[in-house]
Amino acid sequence: MVTIRLARGGAKKRPFYNIVVADSRNARDGRFIERVGFFNPVARGQEEALRLDLDRVEHWVANGAATTDRVAKLIKDARKAAA
């Protein structure tokens, strides 16, 4: 099953997540099909906290990709910010 989920990066105590489309059987930070954005939960000031390619997300969801709960919330936030 193809899922849209977070892949953790960054340093210890400084998380940074790539939002990726991946096969659910692959490891969390392992092989992925496409990177559709990023999420920086510790962004400060003018730093960009969330960037998401909504066209690609909609493409993958239309083709049967499932989203994790956290990514679904991030997509909702990105749509609200874009409107």
Curated annotation (Swiss-Prot):
Q: Which domain of life is it from?
A: Bacteria
One GO location term (cellular component): small ribosomal subunit
The protein's matches in InterPro entries, at most eight in alphabetical order, are given as:
Ribosomal_bS16, Ribosomal_bS16_CS, Ribosomal_bS16_dom_sf
Q: Which keywords does UniProt give here? A: Ribonucleoprotein, Ribosomal protein
Molecular function (Gene Ontology), one example:
structural constituent of ribosome
Single Gene Ontology BP annotation: translation
Pfam families reported for this sequence: Ribosomal_S16
Q: Which PANTHER family match?
A: 30S RIBOSOMAL PROTEIN S16, SMALL RIBOSOMAL SUBUNIT PROTEIN BS16M
Family per similarity comment: Belongs to the bacterial ribosomal protein bS16 family.
What protein does this entry describe? Small ribosomal subunit protein bS16
Organism ancestry: Bacteria, Pseudomonadati, Pseudomonadota, Gammaproteobacteria, Alteromonadales
